């Protein structure tokens, strides 16, 4: 019985690791975290297009840290009346996403 439980736990751990590793690119990470349900790279959907976010924050030294907080905690009032909810991402994932967003042209 202990071997069955141990094997089940190992399988679960492997599945979790595989799903985390599945997002090999920032765009895949954005898709897996459902960012693309409200955002697109070039067109406004519910939220702003990522290229517009990059243009707005271009040259701002604190842009990455500011946007990481918005991604993690949510926010409102910057892009219109629809608030962005907080997102279930790690600090590292938020930084990866924001660096990718700020690189859009």
Kindly give the residue locations of the regions a language model identified.
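N-terminal export/targeting leaders of redox proteins
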Residues: 1-24, 105
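Axial heme c-ligation environment in periplasmic c-type cytochrome domains
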Residues: 37, 46-57, 70-99, 104
